[in-house]
Amino acid sequence: MVELEWLETFEIGLQEIDDDHREMLRIMQDIKAAGEARDRKRCARLLDALIDYSKAHFEREEKILDEIEYPSLEVHEAYHADLLNRAEEVKEACKAIRSDRDFRECCEQMFGFLIDDVITGDMKIKSFLQERGIAEPN
């Protein structure tokens, strides 16, 4: 399975959002460990936990973006909705798999979820925050 490590470059400069991203990574590290231990029940619970936490994170993030008048908020909200839909599909596919190896590979697809959110989606927010002087470049 892939290695999951927090990098300072992932930070967007808003503590609450950065803390959420770290927690999402921690849950994914737990998913990885459960997959390696072939603990499918724990892995399935953690997939649910990751999606639940992500939903709450997206709500917090969208509220903050609304408060700072982020110009692409509606696009970002739609992006979050798409990520959640894809994550739910991956989760259900993982739960239906019978082979341990295929299950671990399926769980790895979920890792793209955080990477997609942090790298693709939230780096645009980071640029906006830095342009506005709300966050310092790191």
Language-model segment annotations:
Residues 1-138:
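Small-residue-biased structural context
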